[in-house]
């Protein structure tokens, strides 16, 4: 079965960790993961400058490792990312910013990628959002 995930929550939330565990489990069961779309506060997953304590699980890094092992898309909503200071080199140039901080395992893109994930997946599972 082909899945896509929609993550609304920041890396520090239980909902985000549950999304990662779900992705890891479905891949272990030989299902396919088409795309993980990070929306609203989920955009914070894209920050490459986030520092996690030595005794904490680095969820953003873990997504990158899982993505490299299983070759699926990790997409940060561009509007949510820009609003939260997550920016790639292209957008840094566009907005005259001297730096960028998007993780190299992720991409910034619009809601069309979420619509595409809905069309190309058999299931879209959402994690986080209101009332986490």
Predicted feature residues:
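N-terminal glycine-rich phosphate/adenylate-binding segment common to multiple enzyme folds
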Residues: 78-132
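Short connector loops at secondary-structure junctions
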Residues: 37-46
């Amino acid at each position: 079965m082909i899945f896509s995930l929609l993550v609304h929550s920041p890396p520090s939330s239980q909902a985000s960790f549950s999304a990662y565990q779900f992705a890891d489990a479905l891949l272990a069961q030989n299902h396919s993961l088409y795309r993980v779309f990070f929306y609203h506060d989920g955009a914070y997953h894209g920050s490459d400058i986030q520092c996690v304590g030595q005794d904490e699980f680095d969820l953003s890094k873990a997504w990158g490792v899982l993505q490299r092992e299983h070759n699926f898309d990790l997409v940060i909503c561009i509007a949510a990312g820009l609003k939260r200071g997550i920016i790639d080199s292209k957008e840094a140039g566009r907005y005259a910013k001297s730096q960028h901080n998007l993780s190299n395992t992720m991409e910034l893109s619009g809601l069309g990628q979420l619509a595409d994930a809905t069309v190309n997946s058999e299931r879209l599972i959402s994690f986080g959002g209101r009332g986490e």
